[in-house]
Amino acid sequence: MNITEFEQHVVEQRAVAAGHYDAEYFTGAWRDAGNNYNLETRRQIEGKNPALIKEVFQPTKVLDLGCGPGALMHLLHELGVDVDGIDFAQSSKELATPEVRDRIAVGYVGDATLKPDAAYDVVVCREVLEHLTVLQVKQTVANMARMTSKYIYVTTRFHPSPASLLDFTTQFDVDPSHITLLNKDMLRLMFVLEGCRSRPDLEAKMDWGHKGRVLVLEKA
């Protein structure tokens, strides 16, 4: 993809509406067995992720950006971690457990008015960016860099075989709202341009499943 093609594709992208992420999206029969968003299913899927977040980052205060119904928030809460969440969908708050429901703010993940600067020592953003347009990804990256005082931990789906830095694709066979799979280097570049530096040592610790979908950045 050259710059002209990139520009055209970016202009043509359309954002997914918040209403798409309703109860059917999170818990409906369309999901593969064992992949819905009820707490006990997510507990099995998360495995050691919550404990690793606490161990690797040793956080005082965590923000789960694009938290969905708050399953990771609940699991971190069980470990004694102080955690807030932001999600685009009202259904996320409605489906959350009582322990974390009131800690979820409903709003756009790129909205710079929802939380103060440097309010969290870790901003977590997992399996969110693929649901955004390229322009929304750029805004959300900037917002993460603004809200963190130290670390950003991201997982997302990346382009499986990009021919250039600018290449991005979709993944509608997995989820109809997977509209942006970037080149991994492009996403890293966006964070670097926001004043963050890569932490490959921490990426190796967090990518215990060896899926190649983890980025860890530290605010410079």
Residue ranges and their predicted role:
Residues L166-V174:
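Short glycine/proline- and charge-enriched loop/turn segments
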Residues N143-M147:
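Conserved helix-to-beta-strand junction in the class I
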Residues T148-F158:
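Conserved beta-strand signature within the Rossmann-like core of class I S-adenosyl-L-methionine
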Residues E218-A220:
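C-terminal lobe and adjacent flexible extensions of AdoMet/dcAdoMet transferase-like proteins
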Residues T133, P162:
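Glycine/Thr-rich phosphate-binding loops of Rossmann-like dinucleotide-binding domains
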Residues M1-A118, V122-V124, L135-A142, F158, ...:
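Conserved N-terminal segment of class I S-adenosyl-L-methionine
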Residues A96, S164-L165:
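Short, well-ordered secondary-structure micro-motifs
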Residues R126-H131:
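Short catalytic micro-motifs in class I SAM-dependent methyltransferases
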